[in-house]
């Protein structure tokens, strides 16, 4: 009897604090994933770093042996200055003198990476005035970019995701959840093909020292806004039509980022993923927890825009992936 009471009380305790338990496991899982990544990266990259260090020491020792008139401190000072300039995107190589980092097209590419928070790091402001302007420009430009992307993604999502799903649901009678899942998978496949595989093949042809894997790596690092900066297109010494190439890359990165956000928004609106996310949200038991700062208690690109714009008609279609009463149509088909 006591055991059954204790068991039932434990079950009630777990159910009462289920959200807290799920959140705790989420934090633990994230920390373990961080540790897992660190272990894998360290085990894979550390041997290559050690080999590179040994190779550089051998080259340096051989160079000093062949040039006895040059002392090691002088060489260290020269190499330090070269590496410092390289961090600012300035190369000492003679065949790299023709590439300017701050002409208009390069500055346009830099501005796009700053506003999208990609930040490759291959080119950075040299002067104090440039650094100060970069701070002010980013403080204003990054929220402006978020507003711009929010508006674009909301409009694109209506035409690319919501209306097609609603059309197949009403016109053909398919389950809205099934249509939404199939549509999300197809949209993801098309996006990966158009903004990853095809551009990677193009970059592997245009960039002399890039293979397909390195090109695909650049596309992923860029469109996910990681922006490590180890691969930056258009920096080759014999790059033809460099200005036009830089403008094309800027357009590709902007369109690719919009496409990625549309796909992300499409998957986030799936009913199954919404239920999964709610497992980790705090349970609103108190009255003060029910007070919404915003009109909708959710954060998504489309919902934010709907709150700002107040588009009630679009708001009716903002939940196309859950079962709801279909709007009446005389012909049994959508009028759009």
Swiss-Prot record:
GO terms for cellular component: apical plasma membrane; brush border membrane; dendrite; endosome; inward rectifier potassium channel complex; membrane; perikaryon; plasma membrane. The record marks 118 as: Important for increased permeability to Na(+) when K(+) levels are subphysiological. Detected in spiral ganglion neurons. Detected in hippocampus CA1 and CA1 regions and in the molecular layer of the dentate gyrus. Detected on hippocampus astrocytes. Highly expressed in the stria vascularis in the cochlea. Detected in pancreas islet beta cells. Detected in kidney, at brush border membranes in proximal tubules and in cytoplasmic structures in distal convoluted tubules, thick ascending limbs and collecting ducts (at protein level). Widely expressed. Detected in spiral ganglion cells. It comes from Mus musculus. Residues 104-116, 117-122, 212-224, 225-231 dip into the membrane without crossing it. Residues 293-299 are annotated as: Important for intracellular retention in recycling endosomes. Homodimer; disulfide-linked. Heterodimer with KCNK2; disulfide-linked. In astrocytes, forms mostly heterodimeric potassium channels with KCNK2, with only a minor proportion of functional channels containing homodimeric KCNK1. Interacts with KCNK3 and KCNK9, forming functional heterodimeric channels. Interacts with GNG4. Identified in a complex with PSD and ARF6; interacts only with PSD that is bound to ARF6. Interacts with UBE2I. This is Potassium channel subfamily K member 1. The modification Phosphoserine is found at residue 326.
């Amino acid at each position: 009897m006591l055991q059954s009471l204790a068991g039932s009380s434990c079950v009630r305790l777990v159910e009462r604090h289920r959200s807290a338990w799920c959140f705790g496991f989420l934090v633990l899982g994230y920390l373990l994933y961080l540790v897992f990544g660190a272990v894998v990266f360290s085990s894979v990259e550390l041997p290559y770093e050690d080999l590179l260090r040994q190779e550089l020491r051998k080259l340096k020792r051989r160079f000093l042996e062949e040039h006895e008139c040059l002392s090691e401190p002088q060489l260290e000072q020269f190499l330090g200055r070269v590496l410092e300039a390289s961090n600012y995107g300035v190369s000492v190589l003679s065949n790299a003198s023709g590439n300017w980092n701050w002409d208009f097209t390069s500055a346009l590419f830099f501005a796009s990476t700053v506003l999208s928070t990609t930040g490759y790091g291959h080119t950075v402001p040299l002067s104090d005035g440039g650094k100060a302007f970069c701070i002010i420009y980013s403080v204003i430009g990054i929220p402006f970019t978020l507003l711009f992307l929010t508006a674009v993604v909301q409009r694109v999502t209506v035409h690319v995701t919501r209306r097609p799903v609603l059309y197949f649901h009403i016109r053909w009678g398919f389950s809205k959840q099934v249509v939404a899942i199939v549509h999300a998978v197809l949209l993801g496949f098309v996006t990966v093909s158009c903004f990853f595989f095809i551009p990677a093949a193009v970059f592997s042809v245009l960039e002399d020292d890039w293979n397909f894997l390195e090109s695909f790596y650049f596309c992923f690092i860029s469109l996910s806004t990681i922006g490590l900066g180890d691969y930056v297109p258009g920096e080759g010494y014999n790059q033809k039509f460099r200005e036009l190439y830089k403008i094309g890359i800027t357009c590709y990165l902007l369109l690719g980022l919009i496409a990625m956000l549309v796909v992300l928004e499409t998957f986030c609106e799936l009913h199954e993923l919404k239920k999964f996310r709610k497992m980790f949200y705090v349970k609103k038991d108190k009255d003060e927890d029910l007070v919404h700062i915003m009109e909708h208690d959710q954060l998504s690109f489309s919902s934010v825009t709907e709150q700002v714009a107040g588009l009630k008609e679009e708001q009716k279609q903002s939940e196309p992936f859950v079962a709801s009463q279909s709007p009446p149509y005389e012909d049994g088909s959508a009028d759009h």
